[in-house]
C-alpha cells in the first residue's frame, strides 16, 4: 500500500509539472508577439536556440573543412610535459614556445589522451562542440538572471556568427576553454558563491591570460562586497591556485615559468592584427604606442570606477573599509551590478589591446548583447545596435584585415563605450532576492 502511495505521489508530481509546463507554453504562445522582446522569455528562446545550435554545430563539423593552426603545437607542448620536461623554456611546438600558464597544460593533457595523443581530430571537434554548447548554456543563465536583453538578440549571438563557430570547432583554440571557465565563474558570483567564483576565475586565467581583463572589475566587486580585509581571502584563493597549478614548473625553473606563461610584454605579429591594420607596422611595434594604450586603458578603468561603478557619494577609498563601518549602509550586489562591472572591465581592455587576433573574438563576443542592450542610451535604437553588432561581425570575418575593417571595429567599440558612459546607471534595482554570500 505504501508503495502504491509513493507511486501515485510520483505520478502526481509528474502530472503537476507537465501541467505547469503546458500552461507556460500556452501563455508563451498567447503572448508570442512579446516572445522575442520580453527578457522574461529568455530561457524559452535559449532552449530553442540551443537545440538549433546542436544541429548547426555538428553540421559545421561534418561539412566544413577543419583548419590546422595551433592544435598540433598544443599537443607537442603538452607531450613535452608528459615526457618529463618541466622547464618552461624547453617546451615548444611548431608555432613557437609554450606561452600559456599551467592550467592550459593540464586541460590539454586531458585532451591529448582523449584524442589518441592528439591525432583524432574529429573527437577533438566533438569535445569542443560540447564546450561550445556549455558556453551558450552558461551565457544564457547569466542573461536570464540579469533580465535586460530582449531574446531576439540571442539569434545573432548564436546561429549567425560563422567566426565563433570556426574558433570553437574548426580551429580548436584554447581561448574557448578559458572563456567557458570564466562564464562558470560569473555564474558562481551571481549565486553569491564568491570563493568558488574566484577559484574558477583563477582557473580560467591559468588557461589564458586574457581573462585578466576582467580582473579590475572583479577586484572592485570584491572590495565593494567585503572591504579590503574581507577580500584578502578571496584574492588568496586566486593567487594560491596559480601557485599550486604551477608548482611542478616553479620548482624546476621559476623564472622560466613566470617569464613564459605570464609574459605581458610579448610582441604580436602585424600580419595577424584585426584592430590596428590602418597603422604603419613600425608604429604598431613601437613601445611608446604600447605604453600609450596601457595609459588609456588604466585611465578609462579609473574613470569608470570613480564615475560609473562607485555611486555611494563616499570616497572610493571607502571601499577599503569593512562594509559595516561605511557611512552608506552596504547593499547586496545585484546581478546587473556584477555583470555590468565585469563585462565593462573586459571590454575596456579589449578596446585598448595592443593587437587582436581572430581567435580573440570569443573574449567578448558573448558579452556584446549585454553591453549594447542592458544600459541603452536613448539615441541608440534597436536598429543601430544591430548595425553595430553586424559591423563588428563583418570586421572579424574580414581576412586579411584591412584599414577599413579595423577602423570600423574601432568606431563600433567607440559607440559602445560612449553608450556605457552616457547610458542609464548600470546599477538598477535587483529583480531577485539576495542570497547569503559564501
From Swiss-Prot:
It catalyses: an alpha-D-Man-(1->2)-alpha-D-Man-(1->2)-alpha-D-Man-(1->3)-[alpha-D-Man-(1->6)]-beta-D-Man-(1->4)-beta-D-GlcNAc-(1->4)-alpha-D-GlcNAc-diphospho-di-trans,poly-cis-dolichol + a di-trans,poly-cis-dolichyl beta-D-mannosyl phosphate = an alpha-D-Man-(1->2)-alpha-D-Man-(1->2)-alpha-D-Man-(1->3)-[alpha-D-Man-(1->3)-alpha-D-Man-(1->6)]-beta-D-Man-(1->4)-beta-D-GlcNAc-(1->4)-alpha-D-GlcNAc-diphospho-di-trans,poly-cis-dolichol + a di-trans,poly-cis-dolichyl phosphate + H(+). It is an enzyme of class 2 (transferase). GO terms for molecular function: alpha-1,3-mannosyltransferase activity; dol-P-Man:Man(5)GlcNAc(2)-PP-Dol alpha-1,3-mannosyltransferase activity. Dol-P-Man:Man(5)GlcNAc(2)-PP-Dol alpha-1,3-mannosyltransferase that operates in the biosynthetic pathway of dolichol-linked oligosaccharides, the glycan precursors employed in protein asparagine (N)-glycosylation. The assembly of dolichol-linked oligosaccharides begins on the cytosolic side of the endoplasmic reticulum membrane and finishes in its lumen. The sequential addition of sugars to dolichol pyrophosphate produces dolichol-linked oligosaccharides containing fourteen sugars, including two GlcNAcs, nine mannoses and three glucoses. Keywords: Congenital disorder of glycosylation, Disease variant, Endoplasmic reticulum, Glycosyltransferase, Membrane, Phosphoprotein, Transferase, Transmembrane, Transmembrane helix. The lineage of its organism: Eukaryota, Metazoa, Chordata, Craniata, Vertebrata. The gene is ALG3. It is linked to Congenital disorder of glycosylation 1D: A form of congenital disorder of glycosylation, a multisystem disorder caused by a defect in glycoprotein biosynthesis and characterized by under-glycosylated serum glycoproteins. Congenital disorders of glycosylation result in a wide variety of clinical features, such as defects in the nervous system development, psychomotor retardation, dysmorphic features, hypotonia, coagulation disorders, and immunodeficiency. InterPro entries: Glycosyltransferase_ALG3. This is Dol-P-Man:Man(5)GlcNAc(2)-PP-Dol alpha-1,3-mannosyltransferase. Its main location: endoplasmic reticulum.
Amino acid at each position: 500500500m505504501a508503495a502504491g502511495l509513493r507511486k501515485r505521489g510520483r505520478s502526481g508530481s509528474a502530472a503537476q509539472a507537465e501541467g505547469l509546463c503546458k500552461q507556460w507554453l500556452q501563455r508563451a504562445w498567447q503572448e508570442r508577439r512579446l516572445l522575442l522582446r520580453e527578457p522574461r522569455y529568455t530561457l524559452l528562446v535559449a532552449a530553442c536556440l540551443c537545440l538549433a545550435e546542436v544541429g548547426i554545430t555538428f553540421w559545421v563539423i561534418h561539412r566544413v573543412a577543419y583548419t590546422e593552426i595551433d592544435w598540433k603545437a598544443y599537443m607537442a607542448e603538452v607531450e613535452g610535459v608528459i615526457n618529463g620536461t618541466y622547464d618552461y623554456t624547453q617546451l615548444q611546438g611548431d608555432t613557437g614556445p609554450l606561452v600559456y600558464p599551467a592550467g592550459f597544460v593540464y586541460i590539454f593533457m586531458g585532451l591529448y589522451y582523449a584524442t589518441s595523443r592528439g591525432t583524432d581530430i574529429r573527437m577533438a571537434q566533438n569535445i569542443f562542440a560540447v564546450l561550445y554548447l556549455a558556453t551558450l548554456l552558461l551565457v544564457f543563465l547569466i542573461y536570464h538572471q540579469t533580465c535586460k536583453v530582449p531574446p531576439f538578440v540571442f539569434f545573432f549571438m548564436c546561429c549567425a556568427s560563422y567566426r565563433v563557430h570556426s574558433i570553437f570547432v574548426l580551429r580548436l583554440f584554447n581561448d574557448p576553454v578559458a572563456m567557458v571557465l570564466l562564464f562558470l565563474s560569473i555564474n558562481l558570483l551571481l549565486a553569491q558563491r564568491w570563493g568558488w567564483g574566484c577559484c574558477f576565475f583563477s582557473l580560467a586565467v591559468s588557461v589564458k591570460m586574457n581573462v585578466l581583463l576582467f580582473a579590475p572589475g572583479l577586484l572592485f566587486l570584491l572590495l565593494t562586497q567585503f572591504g579590503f580585509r574581507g577580500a584578502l581571502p578571496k584574492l588568496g584563493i586566486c593567487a594560491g591556485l596559480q601557485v599550486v597549478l604551477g608548482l611542478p614548473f616553479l620548482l624546476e625553473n621559476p623564472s622560466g615559468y613566470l617569464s613564459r606563461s605570464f609574459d605581458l610584454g610579448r610582441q604580436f605579429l602585424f600580419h595577424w592584427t584585426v584592430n590596428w591594420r590602418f597603422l604603419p607596422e613600425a608604429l604598431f611595434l613601437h613601445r611608446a604606442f604600447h605604453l600609450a594604450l596601457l595609459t588609456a586603458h588604466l585611465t578609462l578603468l579609473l574613470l569608470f570606477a570613480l564615475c560609473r561603478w562607485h555611486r555611494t557619494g563616499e570616497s572610493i577609498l571607502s571601499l577599503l573599509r569593512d562594509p559595516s563601518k561605511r557611512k552608506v549602509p552596504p547593499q547586496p550586489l545585484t546581478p546587473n551590478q556584477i555583470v555590468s562591472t565585469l563585462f565593462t572591465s573586459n571590454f575596456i581592455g579589449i578596446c585598448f589591446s595592443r593587437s587582436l587576433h581572430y581567435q580573440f573574438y570569443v573574449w567578448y563576443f558573448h558579452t556584446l548583447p549585454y553591453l549594447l542592450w542592458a544600459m541603452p542610451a536613448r539615441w541608440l535604437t534597436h536598429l543601430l545596435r544591430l548595425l553595430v553588432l553586424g559591423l563588428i561581425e563583418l570586421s572579424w570575418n574580414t581576412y586579411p584585415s584591412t584599414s577599413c575593417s579595423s577602423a570600423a571595429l574601432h568606431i563600433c567599440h567607440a559607440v559602445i563605450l560612449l553608450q556605457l558612459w552616457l547610458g542609464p546607471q548600470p546599477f538598477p534595482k535587483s529583480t531577485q532576492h539576495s542570497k547569503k554570500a559564501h
